[in-house]
């Protein structure tokens, strides 16, 4: 799908390139189906960006020390996106998903839930530990560590989402 997206962008006149996880520089440990990112070598991504190209990266995968392809497990694509944002010193990482943001409860299961405009990293980690599946713990922990705000947005509906950050204004 990364190659198809890059091809579609190129057809629209937007210079794009696609990279697998290992081409993008994701290095992981050896836990094949739930690997952790140990290093992100951003030279290739940076080189493409310097050439004014849109870089479409396959999330969820990397390469271990034995040059074996690994997968990051549940939420691996979100974690990959946050890792790239942190490595490139971005202020914010947008995560597009099937919901319009973070809610007080799962709107598919509970009536009268409220979408949150903002939430702290710690509050999001608490929700995730209680079963919220909007963002997984690894991506939120990484965003908190590198102070990269997360913006949860809907892939289906262009409405404001939820910003996950260090401090929320009262």
Give the label of every model feature segment.
Residues 1-140:
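Nucleotide/pyrophosphate-binding catalytic subdomain
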Residues 163-170:
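A conserved regulatory-domain signal marking ACT and ACT-like small-molecule sensing domains
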Residues 1, 6-7, 153-156, 170:
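Proteins with a high burden of low-complexity, intrinsically disordered sequence enriched in S/T/G/P/A and R
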Residues 28-29, 161-163:
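Short, solvent-exposed polar/charged micro-motifs at secondary-structure junctions
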């Amino acid at each position: 799908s990364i190659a198809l997206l890059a091809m579609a962008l190129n057809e629209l006149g937007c210079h794009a390139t696609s990279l697998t996880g290992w081409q993008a520089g994701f290095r992981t440990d050896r836990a094949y189906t739930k690997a952790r990112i140990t290093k992100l070598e951003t030279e290739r991504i940076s080189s493409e960006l310097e050439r004014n190209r849109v870089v479409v990266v396959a999330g969820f995968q990397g390469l271990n020390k034995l040059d074996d392809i690994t997968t990051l497990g549940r939420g691996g694509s979100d974690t990959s996106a946050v890792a790239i944002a942190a490595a490139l010193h971005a202020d914010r990482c947008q995560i597009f998903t099937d919901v319009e943001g973070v809610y007080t409860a799962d709107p598919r299961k509970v009536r009268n839930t409220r979408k949150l405009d903002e939430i702290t990293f710690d509050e999001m980690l608490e929700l995730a530990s209680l079963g919220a599946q909007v963002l997984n713990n690894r991506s939120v922990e990484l965003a908190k560590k590198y102070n990269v705000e997360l913006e949860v947005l809907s892939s289906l509906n262009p409405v404001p989402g939820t910003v996950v950050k260090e401090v929320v204004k009262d």
